[in-house]
Curated annotation (Swiss-Prot):
Subunit structure: Component of the small ribosomal subunit. Mature ribosomes consist of a small (40S) and a large (60S) subunit. The 40S subunit contains about 33 different proteins and 1 molecule of RNA (18S). The 60S subunit contains about 49 different proteins and 3 molecules of RNA (28S, 5.8S and 5S). Interacts with ribosomal protein S21.
Protein name: Small ribosomal subunit protein uS2
Role played: Required for the assembly and/or stability of the 40S ribosomal subunit. Required for the processing of the 20S rRNA-precursor to mature 18S rRNA in a late step of the maturation of 40S ribosomal subunits.
Source organism per UniProt: Culex quinquefasciatus (Southern house mosquito)
Gene3D superfamilies reported for this sequence: Glucose-6-phosphate isomerase like protein, domain 1
Record PANTHER family: 40S RIBOSOMAL PROTEIN SA (PTHR11489)
Subcellular location: Cytoplasm
Origin superkingdom: Eukaryota
One Pfam short name: Ribosomal_S2
Protein family (similarity comment): Belongs to the universal ribosomal protein uS2 family.
GO BP term, pick one: ribosomal small subunit assembly
GO cellular component, as recorded: cytosolic small ribosomal subunit
Length: 290
């Protein structure tokens, strides 16, 4: 499927990621249509998936998704809790339409209901749990891409990507790989994608609460380095003379002789002004007498 092109070949780094996420581990039973994707069977009865075939089908699915002119007409669906976060992240980066959670029956066939949609391509996490949208897609001729385990039914599935659909890490990694290849074909990213696959992994709400509690316990130790007292606000446009006024009595107490001498002079100056006014008035009267 890669056409002997290095850029489309399966890299060792991707193989290591698949092995770490147990993407190659299937189930104990095999559907007759999935036998061609099984590499071998372990002594404990678990079937091993051929990762070479997984990569070929992943590239084929990425080409089909990239060929859609309007990305919003591609619907990513996951009713399983482990795949809902991965579906939302895939839709965010590829501009697809996500349906995470319960699928409304008749969304593809009943034109009367408000939730009616007409997608051009459907991607499901597991055809066994997402059987309702897969069945409705067959009624309206919508092609379906599905991540399939060794025991998954391939009825109404057009492109099956063999992988482990029971591991949260495997589901998140496969959605991450599919999003990366789609963005490569659209020319939006280079060979390497800086986004980590951990962002697509399912996170348990209880573990998140424990992490938040641990952060809250560590927060008081960090707060001891700082004071909780509020900093007084500085009033803008205040009268700076009012702030210096309280210092005047202290200065007067320090030099009482100078302050006491200055007061009579000010009174005398006021009296002199009053006398001058009265004298001028009497002089005018005297002048008028002549």
């Amino acid at each position: 499927m890669s056409g002997n092109l290095d850029i489309l070949a399966l890299k060792d780094d991707d193989v290591n990621k698949m092995l770490a996420a147990t993407t190659h581990v299937g189930s104990t039973s095999v559907n007759f249509q999935m036998e061609s994707y099984v590499f071998k069977r372990r002594p404990d009865g678990v079937h091993i998936i051929n990762l070479g075939r997984t990569w070929e089908k992943l590239l084929l699915a990425a080409r089909c998704i990239a060929s859609i002119e309007y990305p919003g007409e591609v619907f990513a669906i996951s009713s399983r809790q482990f795949g809902q976060r991965a579906v939302l992240k895939f839709a965010h980066y590829t501009e697809a339409t996500p349906i995470a959670g319960r699928f409304t029956p008749g969304a593809f066939t009943n034109q009367i209901q408000p939730a009616f949609r007409e997608p051009r391509l459907l991607i499901v996490t597991d055809p066994l749990t997402d059987h309702q949208p897969v069945t409705e897609a067959s009624y309206v001729n919508i092609p379906v891409i599905a991540f399939c385990n060794t025991d998954s039914p391939l009825k109404f599935v057009d492109i099956a990507i063999p992988c482990n659909t029971k591991s949260p890490h495997s589901i998140g990694l496969m959605w991450w790989l599919l999003a990366r290849e789609v963005l490569k074909l659209r020319g939006k990213i280079s060979d390497k994608w800086e986004l980590k696959p951990d962002l697509f992994f399912y996170r348990d709400p209880e573990e998140q609460e424990k992490e938040q509690a641990a952060l809250l316990e560590a927060a008081p130790a960090a707060k001891e380095m700082y004071t909780d007292e509020p900093i007084p606000a500085v009033e803008e446009g205040g009268n700076w003379g009012e702030e210096a006024a309280p210092a005047a009595p202290a200065a007067a107490a320090a030099v009482p002789a100078v302050a006491g001498a200055a007061i009579p002079q000010m009174i005398q100056a006021d009296d002199w002004n009053e006398d001058e006014t009265q004298t001028a008035g009497s002089w005018g009267g005297a002048t008028g007498g002549f």
